[in-house]
């Protein structure tokens, strides 16, 4: 039995740290120890990341990053970021704790999720800025022309410019409203809504909002279809999907909304148009923020590039599934599966 003297804390701390290393075997976090520049221990997670035969390797071969190795071999330890340890270019943080003169305890933390979130945030800000800057530049250009007395121009030209300014201002307003809507939805995405909502009623009321001559049909295999949900958000989903069918489908319609209650406790809601359809390579990305299959057509139709992203977030908040099916020349069907309310 080993006796530790608490009058000399260094050996005690070292022994406790070494004993703790054995507990790391069952952790999901990759961890290893280095003695005299060689890997002396690696838990299962570290072996899965760096290789099954990592024990006994020179740390310079195991880690393959000069900056990280320098931290590992330093007298003070510390942290270093490393990429390329795993397939797919994941980013890792190496945390080095000095156990003794020649021994180190190393923990590795996957930063991929943090990096991905940061990159998505940066992309989102850049895209939002671009989408706002484009109409804003047009507004400034036309306003400056109108204010320039030397430019002249008759009343018809002035009216044309003012209509363009109004159109671009409406584009910015729509974008800001969608950005705020998306922000509100994400803020409460973990709150499961519990109000009783009849989707048949909501579908018929929403279809009645469109008065531009587009034929919107609502067909249901039941008189009512109640789910637990947020009525306003569900109406927003249907409004967005119907509006897409109206804008990108065949001129004048029809846009067909079907509601089918299944025996397995789900409600299938599908919105189908008879437009030109969408190429298959675009389908997986349609719910990404600001992604457009046809940029010029979308902007001409007044789209913000956020509508389907909003739809996806709302459906997921309601514990449902959202899907888009389309073929060029065969129209597009956007569908969602929502759990029916249990009585």
Each predicted region: which residue ranges?
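Sensory modules in modular signal-transduction proteins
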Residues: 9-45
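Short conserved segment of the HATPase_c
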Residues: 278-290
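Conserved glycine-rich
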Residues: 319-320
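PAS-family sensory/regulatory modules and their coupling/dimerization elements
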Residues: 58-113
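Short alpha-helical segment of the dimerization/phosphotransfer core of two-component systems
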Residues: 167-172
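Conserved micro-motifs of the catalytic ATP-binding
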Residues: 187-192, 222, 226-229
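Short helix-loop "hinge" at the ATP-lid/N-box region of the Bergerat-fold HATPase_c
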Residues: 245-246
